[in-house]
């Protein structure tokens, strides 16, 4: 497994920045004042560079919602019981969750991935069964996952991305479902980015002040308990992460390895993106951060990464909802690039010198 993982990292190539001048020249020749479409121009520029072409296409999109349970839920860090994770997976499979509505609206296919739910699901056309284990261990008592389990989850995610590329998908989005998963996400941020736990710990599913203080203490305890196992990004992910987070990390790495951009959802998915960036800094050129989460700490994370999310809608649901929304903005930017007339083709006079 380690050899395959190293091969995956080695296969991630830097983007070709030489495309920038050609893409910019085309954008500047469209029938509008230069730069007047603002961030839409930045977004399609990044999309072109990530996909390695000056003639971008975007017709096939997919959202992957990774699900997993967390042993740390036993510490009482969430307002909801752990059994909500499988219940919400069933809701998604039945078409009733927010991500079902928004992925349909975006014209994106949706697949739910069981990475580590503490429940056994029957086969379903929307469900991919990649279960590593029935939930992670309690990270407040020791590592959430072993290195081998973490690598298994990463490689499963990577294989999903590579398969999607082979099926003709051009843009992927991440989502997640897992009760208590803001707790490992916060621990990952604190450890990998050096952010103070108390400043970035949020209310997640809506916990009160007393439980929020308890959540901070649990995260600080988990980091201290696992202090000896935090030497590398992979060890940090294993000790303080979760199966769905590792799966998303793998999806990002796999997509980058085949030159495919990924739209990262909110607070949880961004923690997986941080793990991927720490494992291979090159992947950041393939990432679109979809939205600024309303979850406390996400703004500090985005600032630390130097990232500017596409949307700011006070979202804090997860599931891939923000990513599905942002997919539509990316698609609009590609259509602008491809479908607008140029000054010469439209017979419109350019700017006076």
Swiss-Prot record:
Gene Ontology biological process terms, A to Z = cobalamin biosynthetic process
Q: Which organism is it from?
A: Chlorobaculum tepidum (strain ATCC 49652 / DSM 12025 / NBRC 103806 / TLS) (Chlorobium tepidum)
Per the Swiss-Prot or TrEMBL record, the active site comprises 319 (proton acceptor)
Instruction: Give the main EC class.
Output: transferase
Report whether Transferase shows up as a keyword of the record: yes
Keyword flag Transferase: yes
Q: Which family does it belong to?
A: Belongs to the CobT family.
Q: Which GO terms describe its molecular function?
A: nicotinate-nucleotide-dimethylbenzimidazole phosphoribosyltransferase activity
- The protein, known as: Nicotinate-nucleotide--dimethylbenzimidazole phosphoribosyltransferase
In which pathway is this protein known to take part? Answer: Nucleoside biosynthesis; alpha-ribazole biosynthesis; alpha-ribazole from 5,6-dimethylbenzimidazole: step 1/2
* Catalytically driven reaction(s): 5,6-dimethylbenzimidazole + nicotinate beta-D-ribonucleotide = alpha-ribazole 5'-phosphate + nicotinate + H(+)
Q: Which Gene3D superfamilies match?
A: 1.10.1610.10, 3.40.50.10210
The task this protein performs is described as: Catalyzes the synthesis of alpha-ribazole-5'-phosphate from nicotinate mononucleotide (NAMN) and 5,6-dimethylbenzimidazole (DMB).
